Amino acid sequence: MIGLGTWVTSVNMMIFKGDITVVIADKDGQYDIDFQLPDKLKDVKIRTYDIVENGNTLKGKGEITMLPGKELEAEVTFNGDKFEGVLRIPFMKRTIELKNGHRISD
């Protein structure tokens, strides 16, 4: 499994601009991804699924409580203790860059 640990990345979205923390763990051989959002977004929940590993890249899908029934897509490429990626919101035809991602703990 790749990318295990606690990561921070910068995002610039309509509802929030700043850093978010992402914890990637191994749960019985499956990726368990937990988003630790700032207090401003404390009621927002994110569910991930269909996570696929390809080399040093993770791709997956998700849903967010603010957009019920709307699927999101993400792709993140790891390079040591850093990563870059994108979050796609297909129904809005929008792509959000995940910038300056870096590991803060294993």
Enumerate the language-model features and the residues they cover.
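Central antiparallel beta-sheet cores of small beta-barrel/beta-sandwich binding domains
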Residues: 1-78, 86-106
